[in-house]
Structures are given as C-alpha cells and as structure tokens.
C-alpha cells in the first residue's frame, strides 16, 4: 500500500480526473448558455444559439439550439436532416 488514504487515491485516479473534467466542461457550457439567454442579442452573430463544444482534447463539434430543429409534419424528419 502506498500510504495514501483510499479517498485520496480515488481523487488522483485518471478516471476520476476525466469525470471532473467532463462535469466542469458541462457546467461551463451551461453557464455560457444562461449568459446568452439573459442578454438581449445585438447582432446576428450574437443571436446565434450554436456553440462549439469539445471534450478530452477531441475535435470540437457544433452544438445547435435544439429549439430550432423542428420536426416537419410531412416527412417526419427534422429540418436539419432535410437540408443535408
């Protein structure tokens, strides 16, 4: 045994560090969303509700506003899928 308390070993483990990173990045993203909702938009770019999001050093992905992706009543597909 290395002399560390089991809780300290868990806190220093790689899996726990990844979990803390994921929780922190999600919290930051949620705070940014709340900030965007609280301030009235001034320009087209500031009205955009999309955001770039990355995790664990992976390539960033574009997260779009889920309220703007409506389901079409005719085809059952979202407008985003129809465009692509």
From Swiss-Prot:
Name this protein carries in UniProt: Uncharacterized protein BRD3OS
Organism for this UniProt entry: Homo sapiens (Human)
User: From which lineage does this chain's organism come?
Assistant: Eukaryota, Metazoa, Chordata, Craniata, Vertebrata
């Amino acid at each position: 045994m290395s002399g560390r308390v089991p809780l300290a070993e868990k806190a220093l483990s790689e899996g726990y560090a990844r979990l803390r990173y994921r929780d922190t990045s999600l919290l930051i993203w949620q705070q940014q969303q709340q900030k965007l909702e609280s301030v009235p938009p001034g320009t087209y770019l500031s009205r955009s509700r999309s955001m770039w999001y990355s995790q664990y050093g992976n390539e960033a992905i574009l997260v779009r506003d889920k309220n703007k992706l409506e389901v079409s009543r005719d085809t059952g597909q979202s407008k985003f899928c129809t465009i692509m």
